[in-house]
């Protein structure tokens, strides 16, 4: 028999082993422990991962995984799958889960442009129960719901979201806040009523006021921004300026001591070039006629001579230019009675000592002309005029600053290049804005069946959709003889058309608003409209064509049609009699300010110089504005929101420094031409 103490020793060693085995057995019986789920945190994985977690979960966390999977599906633009997943959620949700579901439903609707359905859902969200990440998403949805329309609610959403963001997202918020502010007109500013404790919003509005007051002088704007930063040190923009305004800090004025003016002095475009050159020189020498203000009844008839669009793609791009236009003798045409209101005088630079040398681009290759201009010490190039030459210069990587007088087919963003053209595309973009601003949402384009119609259609549609518009319809027409056959047969023109289908590359692939990524839903091509919904028609035609098109529209729609009619300057002519003006009753048309009464004295001077050929007057005005733009080259490139009241329109620049022209819109009313209302 073994000693008792030996037995006790062996038993003592056995007990811990037995306990460990029991513990391990108990743990294995419980199964793997579930991962913790936080539905209020950011989504960091793709939808496949979260859907897998849903399949593997059987406890209370399954619903949380479902909600995360829905967020991931929405982030990836998989809206049908997200909708199906929402339908599979249990009816009973916790308060936290219910708030997350409201955000997900709203996001799905906003992404599918169902804003009216999303807004009441957002109103149910209890912001006090949201995490910081959820709050950022909530305000992002409020911002996206605004669809780019600036309002106090939108500004407040940006301001509320800003402290919830970091890094690039925060800078994007500041930039977007500033962009929204710059959309406010002075009338909008005057109508804003904010609370006394909204110091951040007040600071933003004061920054906008400082910008408006000093935008035309970069140095004054620098000083105004610095003063504003001192007065509002706690404003987020005081610590990190909007990107556009930060560029002002590095602004330096471009040298214009020696300007090279590149024009074709021979060939078909010579007449155009001469008009531009005269306008440029008259502006440089300070010999432009001026008047204190345009007064009611004193404005020239805002109409232009009948011209055909150049067929050559390299021709001068002018909305109504024709190198073979017949010259009219005598002094300026006596205008029809107008009722223009006083307008601001276009900007005019004083006489300058700058040296201007003209180079003939029709006598040698443009590359040689540019090289010669550089060797001659040019600090700024104005031109060339022909499109193929502009494309060559854009591809040449020249070190010189260039104000091209045309646009290439594909705009290239160069820090030393701007593009200024009188093009039908430019008019079409302006028309899209004008029609949109008048509250129209279902436009029809009536354009010729040729390349001009293609260009106008593409430009209008792209701009329209950038404003938030939907489908644009188009209807093509043929020659005058075809239109006459139509009117003689009583066919008329119906307010219907086929949808304009833009290349897929031009369609937005996603929308990123204040840190919230909302992919654009995939949509099929819209079906043709049968009419009835159209509320506006933009007509690009000559006057002869318009005289047939408008009555043909009335034949089908009646004289009391609610469709508003708009026309480009192509259909406006000098000398249109009272019968024509009465026939055009109600139609609105665009033209440059110089032909719309902005400066009657200069208009008379120009009309006399060009024998009342208003197509050349337009190019003369272009030359004047080219001089003004050359003296503000770096402002156009670097100072956000910089604009000029030019003779060809209110001039501003895109991010690629394409000069946009906001035109003057007039209307035929009871035989008179009046400002469009």
From Swiss-Prot:
Interacts with PBP1a. Belongs to the LpoA family. Keywords: Cell outer membrane, Cell shape, Lipoprotein, Membrane, Palmitate, Peptidoglycan synthesis, Signal. GO terms for biological process: peptidoglycan biosynthetic process; regulation of cell shape. CDD domains: PBP1_YraM_LppC_lipoprotein-like. InterPro entries: LpoA (IPR007443), Peripla_BP_I (IPR028082), TPR-like_helical_dom_sf (IPR011990). Regulator of peptidoglycan synthesis that is essential for the function of penicillin-binding protein 1A (PBP1a). It comes from the Bacteria. Residues 313-355 have a biased composition (Low complexity). Disulfide bonds: none annotated. The keyword DNA damage does not apply. This is Penicillin-binding protein activator LpoA. Its main location: membrane.
């Amino acid at each position: 028999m073994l000693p008792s103490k030996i037995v006790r020793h062996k038993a003592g060693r056995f007990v811990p082993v037995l306990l460990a085995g029991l513990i391990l057995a108990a743990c294995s019986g419980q199964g793997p422990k579930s991962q913790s789920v936080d539905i209020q945190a950011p989504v960091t994985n793709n939808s496949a991962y979260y859907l897998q977690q849903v399949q593997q979960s059987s406890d209370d966390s399954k619903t949380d995984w479902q909600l995360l999977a829905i967020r991931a599906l929405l982030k990836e633009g998989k809206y049908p799958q997200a909708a199906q997943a929402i339908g599979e959620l249990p009816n009973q949700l916790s308060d936290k889960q219910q708030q997350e579901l409201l955000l997900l439903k709203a996001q799905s609707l906003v992404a599918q442009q169902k804003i009216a359905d999303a807004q009441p859902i957002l109103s149910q969200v209890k912001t006090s129960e949201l995490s910081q990440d959820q709050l950022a998403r909530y305000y992002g949805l409020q911002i996206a719901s605004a669809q780019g329309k600036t309002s106090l609610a939108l500004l407040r959403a940006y301001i509320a979201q800003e402290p919830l963001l970091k890094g690039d997202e925060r800078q994007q918020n500041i930039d977007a806040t500033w962009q929204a502010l710059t959309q406010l007109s002075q009338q909008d500013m005057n109508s804003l009523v904010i609370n006394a404790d909204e110091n951040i919003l007040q600071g933003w509005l004061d920054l906008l006021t400082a910008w408006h007051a000093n935008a035309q002088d970069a140095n004054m704007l620098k000083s105004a921004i610095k003063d504003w930063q001192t007065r509002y040190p706690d404003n987020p923009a005081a610590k990190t300026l909007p990107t556009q305004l930060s560029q002002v800090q590095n602004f330096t004025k471009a040298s214009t001591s020696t300007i090279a003016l590149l024009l074709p002095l021979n060939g078909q475009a010579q007449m155009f070039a001469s008009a531009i050159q005269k306008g440029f020189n008259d502006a440089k020498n300070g010999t432009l006629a001026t008047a204190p203000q345009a007064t009611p009844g004193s404005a020239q008839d805002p109409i232009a001579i009948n011209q055909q669009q150049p067929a050559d793609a390299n021709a001068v791009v002018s909305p109504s230019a024709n190198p073979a236009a017949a010259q009219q003798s005598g002094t300026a045409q006596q205008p029809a009675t107008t009722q223009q209101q006083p307008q601001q005088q276009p900007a005019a630079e004083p006489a300058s000592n700058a040296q201007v040398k003209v180079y003939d681009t029709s006598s040698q290759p443009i590359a040689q002309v540019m090289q010669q201009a550089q060797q001659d010490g040019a600090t700024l190039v104005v031109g060339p005029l022909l499109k193929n030459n502009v494309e060559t210069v854009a591809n040449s990587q020249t070190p010189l600053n260039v104000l091209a007088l045309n646009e290439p087919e594909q705009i290239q963003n160069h820090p030393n290049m701007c593009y200024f053209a009188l093009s039908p595309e430019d008019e079409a973009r302006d028309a899209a804005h004008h029609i949109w601003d008048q509250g129209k949402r279902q436009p029809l384009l009536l354009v010729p069946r040729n390349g001009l119609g293609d260009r106008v259609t593409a430009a209008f549609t792209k701009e329209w959709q950038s404003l938030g518009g939907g489908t644009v319809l188009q209807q093509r027409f043929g020659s005058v003889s075809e239109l006459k056959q139509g009117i003689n047969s009583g066919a008329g023109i119906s307010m219907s058309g086929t949808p304009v289908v833009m290349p897929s590359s031009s369609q937005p692939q996603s929308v990123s608003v204040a840190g919230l990524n909302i992919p654009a839903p995939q949509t099929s091509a819209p079906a043709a409209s049968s009419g009835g919904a159209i509320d506006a028609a933009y007509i690009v035609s000559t006057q002869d064509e318009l005289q047939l098109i408008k009555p043909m529209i009335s034949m089908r729609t009646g004289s009391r049609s609610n469709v508003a009619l708009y026309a480009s300057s192509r259909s406006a002519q000098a000398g249109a009699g009272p019968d024509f003006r009465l026939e055009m009753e109600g139609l609105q048309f665009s033209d440059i300010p110089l032909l719309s009464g902005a400066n009657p004295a200069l208009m008379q001077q120009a009309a006399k110089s060009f024998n009342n050929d208003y197509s050349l007057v337009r190019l003369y005005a272009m030359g004047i504005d080219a001089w003004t733009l050359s003296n503000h080259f770096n402002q156009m490139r670097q100072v956000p929101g910089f604009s000029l009241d030019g003779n060809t329109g209110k001039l501003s620049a895109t991010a690629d420094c394409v000069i946009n022209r906001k035109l003057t819109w007039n209307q035929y009313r009871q035989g008179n031409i009046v400002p469009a209302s």
